[in-house]
Amino acid sequence: MTENAVLQLRAERIARATRPFLARGNRVRRCQRCLLPEKLCLCSTITPAQAKSRFCLLMFDTEPMKPSNTGRLIADILPDTVAFQWSRTEPSQDLLELVQNPDYQPMVVFPASYADEQREVIFTPPAGKPPLFIMLDGTWPEARKMFRKSPYLDNLPVISVDLSRLSAYRLREAQAEGQYCTAEVAIALLDMAGDTGAAAGLGEHFTRFKTRYLAGKTQHLGSITAEQLESV
């Protein structure tokens, strides 16, 4: 199966690593594509979908390495998803060019309460050109840092998603009400943008991932050990 943008970014991160990366469950032997325990691999269930919306994942340092990351699920379902390592001072040239691409309407996905008063904030994708949803993918403190310290994104509007239901995701607990995982927000954005088929496909993929990930945690698969540690 073709590697998606997040897996490619993960491979690049591993290639420049200088020390072992010890995520939770690092002794479990995992599928190197879906990062679930091998016995719970879901790669054969992945079914890509079509959407006019496009996603750009701006990922904090080791985020692509984490089995709990859900940005990878977006790239599984929407193959034209792009992913970049975040940098405050040296952003990827490809990222800068994508943000300036006149074929899209770029916007930063983040809660409205964190935007400055002068920042344009919207709550639904605008009509017209396809939206480019820029998602800041990391822990909540990391996402806040990326939002504050990415001057090359400061001129873009912020789109804020208010999910009325409690988050279904409990792999890594949010630190405050109204904070949701990356894939969950993407599902809502796709639905609001009219990409209902892609929203349904990502929702199904997310549910399968969540179920199998939590099953792997519950089983405490300590006897299924990895042959080698990844580096960071």
From Swiss-Prot:
Annotated motif DXTW, positions: 137-140
EC number: 2.5.1.25
Chain residues that bind Zn(2+): C31, C34, C41, C43
GO molecular function, one term: zinc ion binding
One Pfam family linked to the record: DTW
Hydrolase among keywords: no
Disrupted-gene phenotype: Deletion of the gene leads to the loss of the acp3U modification. Mutant has no obvious defect under normal growth conditions. It shows motility defect and genome instability under continuous heat stress.
Regulation: The degree of the acp3U modification at U47 is dependent on the presence of the m7G modification at the preceding nucleotide G46. It also depends on medium conditions.
Mutation effect (W140A): Strong decrease in activity
Reactions the enzyme catalyzes: a uridine in tRNA + S-adenosyl-L-methionine = a 3-[(3S)-3-amino-3-carboxypropyl]uridine in tRNA + S-methyl-5'-thioadenosine + H(+); uridine(47) in tRNA(Phe) + S-adenosyl-L-methionine = 3-[(3S)-3-amino-3-carboxypropyl]uridine(47) in tRNA(Phe) + S-methyl-5'-thioadenosine + H(+)
Presence of the UniProt keyword Zinc in the record: yes
Gene Ontology biological process terms from the UniProt entry: tRNA modification
Top EC class for this record: transferase
Domain of life of the native organism: Bacteria
UniProt entry keywords in alphabetical sequence: Metal-binding, S-adenosyl-L-methionine, Transferase, tRNA processing, Zinc
Family: Belongs to the TDD superfamily. DTWD2 family. TapT subfamily.
Its job: Catalyzes the formation of 3-(3-amino-3-carboxypropyl)uridine (acp3U) at position 47 of tRNAs. Acp3U47 confers thermal stability on tRNA.
Database matches in PANTHER family: TRNA-URIDINE AMINOCARBOXYPROPYLTRANSFERASE, TRNA-URIDINE AMINOCARBOXYPROPYLTRANSFERASE 2
Domain comment (free text): The N-terminal domain binds zinc and is important for activity.
Subunit and interaction comment: Monomer in solution.
Protein name listed in UniProt: tRNA-uridine aminocarboxypropyltransferase
Gene: tapT
